[in-house]
Amino acid sequence: MYAIIETGGKQYRVQEGDTLFVEKLDANQGDIVTIDSVLAVSKDGNLTVGAPMVAGAKVEAKVLEQGKAKKIIIFKYKPKKDYRRKQGHRQPYTKLVIEKINA
């Protein structure tokens, strides 16, 4: 059994027990979050596709950690003009483990 969910503007194919990194969610470590935006569910070989969401389907996930990804460096410059800008960015993420798929 698997489901296709949407969170943070991205879509993920998940099964029970999967671990995934998603865009930061407003939840504490150890909390259970419910994801209602389920686009499709496959159960016993039958695929149910929503229009746009599957009615009554939910995915429950546990928050393992909140963190920041590796730092990326943004460096802009204009040659011969003495213009240089260096900026760093670390994208926040939430690490989830899928507990249950209700369909």
UniProtKB/Swiss-Prot annotation:
Keyword Ribonucleoprotein: yes
The protein's assembly and partners: Part of the 50S ribosomal subunit. Contacts protein L20.
Biological processes annotated in GO: translation
Family named by the database record: Belongs to the bacterial ribosomal protein bL21 family.
Keyword tags: Ribonucleoprotein, Ribosomal protein, RNA-binding, rRNA-binding
GO cellular component, one term: ribonucleoprotein complex
GO MF term set: rRNA binding; structural constituent of ribosome
Function: This protein binds to 23S rRNA in the presence of protein L20.
Taxonomic classification: Bacteria, Bacillati, Bacillota, Clostridia, Peptostreptococcales
SUPFAM superfamilies documented for this protein: L21p-like
Protein name, UniProt field: Large ribosomal subunit protein bL21
Species of the source: Alkaliphilus oremlandii (strain OhILAs) (Clostridium oremlandii (strain OhILAs))
UniProt-listed InterPro entries: bL21-like (IPR028909), bL21-like_sf (IPR036164), Ribosomal_bL21 (IPR001787), Ribosomal_bL21_CS (IPR018258)
